[in-house]
Each structure stands twice: as C-alpha cells, then as structure tokens.
C-alpha cells in the first residue's frame, strides 16, 4: 500500500520519479505527487487518480536532480489533492513523503502544534510540521529535528524528507514499513520496492526498523536513532526488466496466469536435484520434524493457499496443521501446542499483519518459516528460515501464480519432511513427475480460453451475485475462486462447502443466480456435489460445472486434466482464475488495478 521513490544526484529526477511511481502502481493508490528541486527552483505537483493524471500536470519546467515522489492509499483523510503527498511544513521549507500509519498523530498535534494551520487531514502533514517546528522554532539542526520527531512518533512509517535549503540531501527513516536504498554512481535513491528502481540500478541496501539514512549523490550514511553509524552491505536484486513488463499482453493478470506452467517447472528445478530427490534446507526439515503442530498464518489468497495445502501437508508429514488469519492472531493468539512451528505465507513478504504475528513468534522463541516470492523482504529477513517461490514479479493486484507456487512449494516441503520421517505416502509420491503433469494440465486449461470466456459471458456478464461450491479440497479452491471473482469483477461472490448449502445458504438461491460447482477427488464426493448442484438448479440457479477428467459427464462445462489428488487444488484453480479475468474484462473494468485494493498490505 502506497509507494515512495526518491533520488539525489546526477540524474533527471522527474523522469526517475515518474517511472518509479508507474512501477509502483500495482501496490494500489488513489492519488500521487512529486517534489523536485533544481537549485532555487522548487516544484510540487499533486493529483488525484492515476499516475497518468499526474503526468499530464507536469510541465517541462518541472526538472531537477533531487526529488521525492509518492503514491497514496488513503488512511487518514479522503483522496484529495490536499491530502496527497508530498506534504510541506508550515513555512514550506521541509517536504515529506510517508507510508504507514502514525498512531499518535492527534496527540502530537495537540501537544506540539497548537496554532498551526493544516491544508489537509493526514497524519503525515502533522509529522512534517513537527519537524519544521523543531528546526525553525526550537533551533535544532535538521538531523536532530528528524531524530527528535522519530522519538515521538508511534506507529508504522517509511519517511523520505527534503530540506529545501539543502536540497542535495534526502533524510530517510523506517519502522514496520518497507524501504530500500538504491545505489548508483553519482546518484543514490530510496524506494519502497526494488521494482521502482530496477531501470536505474541493481544494487540495493536494506534499511532495518528504527534506522535513519542520510542520502547524498555520493554517500549513504546509516545511523541508529542514537546517532551511531552502522555498517551495511549492499546486495544485487535478481530482477529482469522483461519480467516487469506486460509484453504483448493486455493485462498483467493474463500474463501471470499464462506463466504458471513455467513457474511449476522452475520450482521443480529449484527444489529437486537431477535424480528427483528433494533439495530442501535440512535445517527446515529437521525443525518441522521436531514440531508437534504446524501453524500456517496468512491473509487473502495466501490464506487460501494454506487451506488448499492443509490436507496434503498432514498426509505427507503426519503433523497436524492449523490455519490462522494473521490479522486476528496478531491480537488474539490462541493456545498453542508444546512444540509449534509457524509457516507464514506472503507473496510480497511485507504483509503487516503477518509481520505482527512473526514478531510475537520471535519473542516467544517459536521457529518460523516464511514462504515468499520476494528475497530480502521483511518477513524473509526476520523469520528463522525462508523458502522462495521463484515465481517472478507478480504485478496484478489479484494474485494467481503466487497461489499455485505456494501450494507447489509446500508440496516440496511436505515430501521432504515426510521422507525424513519415513512416511510411506511421501516416499511413494513422485512429486517431480506429478508436478510436471500439473504444468501440462495448466497448459491444457489455458488452451481453452475462448471456451471459458464464452461461458463467463453467458453466466456472469450482468449478475451482481454468484456462488462457488465444492467439497473437500474443492471447497478450499472455491474460497480462492470466490475471492478472485469479487476482487476484480466486483461481483458479490462467496465460496461455500457444498454440504452446507442446506444449512442456510440455499435461501439465497433464486432464478438466475450463478452457481459454479467444482468437482474433483473421488466418485463418492463427486456424486454428493452433483446432488448439491441439482438442488440449486431446481431452485432456479444458473449452473456452471468445472470437473476433473474421469469424473466428467455429458453437459459439464469445463473439464480439467486429472492430476495427483495432492495437487488437484492447483489444477482446479486455473479455470477459476480465467473465469474471474473474463468476468472483469467483459464488464469493462481495470483487471490489474481493482478499486480500493492494494497488492502489498503494509499497514495493519
């Protein structure tokens, strides 16, 4: 949520800021702005809406070598130009951008800023006024004023600050909100995400919580809040420019759906050797072996991926698995087993709710594993272990390939642990072969795009409500499928256990209500789900069936290639991703950037 870009040095700041903000669009935002300094000429431009709206307001005179930019996701105050970042101090000397939530901003306003007039309603504007006060009224240096403000501010933040009287320096600080330093020759940068700067550099430096950084064109100074200088190594970001472009695709989501066979094969090559043996960190395997219960913590699609993997993990490892909504566990952690193991699923590795749980786990001495798509992310740094998805950047807000990669990665992990335990099911499960078949199954489904699009047009083009139903693993797929549909088509959709229809939900079925039935697993389960489908059809529902090969009957709508039952949640989810995509497309919506949603939820 939100994005920060900043640059100081021998570069065209305006171009870098705008290109960086465009690369951060996927994070979600409702307004944007930039500040650029060129000697005594200062330019501040802000806009509500898309980056294109901001670009249209920027004239050729908005140029300079130092600047900061921001995409805002409204938390305090509505989406207005006044509330858009960057914000300025009372005298306009200081300019600030901020991601996060300042929890004590009202107390700061009352205690320190009586008599100050504000242009908007944001917590950020109060922070920059406070810094300005400490310099211009209390006589502190800029660095001391910034440190003083940081000692007062409570909550999550990533700050980038410019003093217009010394615009060759950017002051940076973070706490519980992602921020990176990008390193160049004759210039340095700050950004929320490496993708924002990958055109300019591949060299980055991490900033840890409660650290302050002073950036000039030739230097990067890292300090703790006591002013002690810290040493920090840089690292090379493994990103390719081709990975973050759409190519010939109209939307990132369709590109990412199509990339899933490649992702499956990438995971095979990463987590198995040439003989087909599992190549998982032995320390991770040993830690899970020693656990008496696995707790999977996640949010959104990652939470659904955890559910889709639960039965597989239990059957392969003989270890009970519990799922937890990270945002709830952060405040109300239940009674745990004697030897718990936490697995945190997060595409971005920056999910604030999951991090809150991880902080508690670390305090309690509970071992943890982060399964993420982003190396060097906060969750990967702070967990005991990390397992990467190797899915490549996922730009579309609605997650697709990260979901299937999470299920596949957990399959590799489960097989490795099961083999170490001598579990027969794990020893006999040829995961490399079976996942190769999954990749082929995905390709077969992707070849049926026209069929799926035509089914969607008949069923979902004008509806306001829809339901997915399934049993067993199909129920877990139904949860993810319904989330995907509601995210990008704005159709009120729910995924239900088919057997629960009679316990209340069937009262919502009326003439024309779309119901999508998912059928895989055994003949018995399939028969029961078909019975539920008949029940809703008898009450006027418009039914679409997605069926695994071998369980299909004449009249079924979409047939998916049969794969191993442990991996069926991957094969069955692919048509539902396409259903969501075409429903959004046919409604004329922005598939990649649905309203009110952010790719990385970095505030609690």
From Swiss-Prot:
Q: Which CDD domains does the record associate with it?
A: GFAT (cd00714), SIS_GlmS_GlmD_1 (cd05008), SIS_GlmS_GlmD_2 (cd05009)
InterPro entries given in the database record? GATase_2_dom, GFAT, GFAT_N, GlmS/AgaS_SIS, GlmS/FrlB_SIS, Ntn_hydrolases_N, SIS_dom, SIS_dom_sf
- Glutamine amidotransferase type-2 domain span: 2-218
* Reaction(s) the record says it catalyses: D-fructose 6-phosphate + L-glutamine = D-glucosamine 6-phosphate + L-glutamate
Task: Tell me which domain of life the UniProt entry assigns to the organism this sequence originates from.
Answer: Bacteria
- Catalytic site: 2, 599
* Record's subcellular location: Cytoplasm
What quaternary arrangement does the UniProt entry report? Homodimer.
What is the annotated role of this protein in its UniProt record?
Catalyzes the first step in hexosamine metabolism, converting fructose-6P into glucosamine-6P using glutamine as a nitrogen source.
Query: What is this protein identified as?
Result: Glutamine--fructose-6-phosphate aminotransferase [isomerizing]
Q: Which organism is it from?
A: Streptococcus pyogenes serotype M6 (strain ATCC BAA-946 / MGAS10394)
Name the gene: glmS
């Amino acid at each position: 949520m939100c994005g920060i870009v900043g640059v100081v040095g021998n570069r065209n700041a305006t171009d870098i800021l705008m290109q960086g903000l465009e690369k951060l669009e996927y994070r979600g935002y409702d307004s944007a702005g930039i500040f650029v300094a060129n000697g005594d000429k200062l330019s501040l431009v802000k806009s509500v809406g898309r980056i294109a709206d901001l670009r249209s307001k920027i004239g050729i005179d908005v140029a300079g070598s130092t600047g900061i930019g921001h995409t805002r996701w409204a938390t305090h105050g509505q989406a207005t130009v006044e509330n858009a970042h960057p914000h300025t101090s009372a005298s306009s000397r200081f300019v600030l951008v901020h991601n996060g939530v300042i929890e004590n901003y009202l107390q700061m306003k009352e205690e320190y800023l009586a008599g100050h007039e504000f242009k908007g309603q944001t917590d950020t504007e109060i922070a920059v006024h406070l810094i300005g006060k400490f310099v211009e009224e209390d006589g502190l240096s800029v660095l001391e004023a910034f440190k003083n403000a940081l000692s007062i501010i409570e909550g999550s933040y990533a700050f980038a600050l410019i003093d217009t009287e010394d615009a060759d320096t950017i002051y940076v600080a973070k706490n519980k909100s992602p921020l990176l330093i990008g390193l160049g020759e004759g210039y340095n940068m700050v950004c929320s995400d490496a993708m924002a700067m990958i055109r300019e550099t591949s060299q980055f430096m991490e900033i840890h919580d409660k650290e302050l950084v002073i950036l000039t064109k030739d230097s990067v100074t890292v300090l703790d809040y006591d002013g002690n200088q810290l040493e920090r190594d840089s690292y090379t970001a493994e990103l390719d420019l081709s990975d973050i472009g759409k190519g010939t695709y109209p939307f990132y989501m369709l590109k990412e759906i199509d990339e899933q066979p490649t992702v499956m094969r990438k995971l095979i090559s990463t987590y198995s050797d040439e003989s087909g043996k599992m190549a998982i960190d032995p320390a991770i395997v040993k830690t899970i072996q020693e656990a008496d219960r696995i707790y999977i913590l996640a949010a959104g699609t990652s939470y659904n991926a955890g559910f889709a993997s639960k039965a597989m993990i239990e059957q392969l490892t003989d270890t009970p698995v519990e799922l937890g909504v990270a945002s709830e566990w952060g405040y109300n952690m239940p009674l745990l087993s004697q030897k718990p193991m936490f697995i945190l699923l997060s595409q971005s590795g920056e999910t604030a709710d999951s991090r809150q749980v991880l902080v508690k786990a670390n305090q309690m001495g509970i071992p943890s594993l982060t399964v993420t798509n982003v190396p060097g992310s906060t969750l990967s740094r702070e967990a005991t272990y990390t397992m990467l998805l190797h899915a490549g950047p996922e730009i579309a807000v609605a997650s697709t390939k990260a979901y299937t990669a999470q299920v596949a990665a957990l399959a590799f992990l489960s097989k490795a642990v099961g083999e170490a335990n001598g579990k027969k099911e794990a020893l006999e499960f040829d995961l490399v072969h079976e996942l190769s078949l999954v990749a082929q199954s995905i390709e077969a489904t992707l070849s049926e795009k026209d069929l799926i699009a035509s089914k969607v047009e008949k069923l979902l083009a004008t509806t306001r409500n829809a339901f997915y139903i399934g049993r067993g693993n199909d129920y877990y797929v139904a949860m993810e499928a319904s989330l995907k549909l509601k995210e990008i088509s704005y159709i009120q959709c729910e995924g239900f256990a088919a057997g629960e229809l009679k316990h209340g939900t069937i009262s919502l079925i009326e003439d024309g209500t779309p119901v999508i039935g998912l059928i895989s697993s055994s003949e018995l389960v399939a028969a029961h789900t078909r019975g539920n489908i008949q029940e809703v059809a008898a009450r006027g529902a418009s039914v679409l069936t997605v069926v695994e090969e071998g369980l299909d009957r004449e009249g079924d709508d979409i047939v998916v290639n049969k794969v191993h039952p442990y991996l069926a949640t991957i094969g069955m989810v692919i048509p539902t991703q396409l259903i969501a995509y075409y429903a959004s497309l046919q409604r004329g919506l922005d598939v990649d950037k649905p309203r009110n949603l952010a790719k990385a939820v970095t505030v609690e």
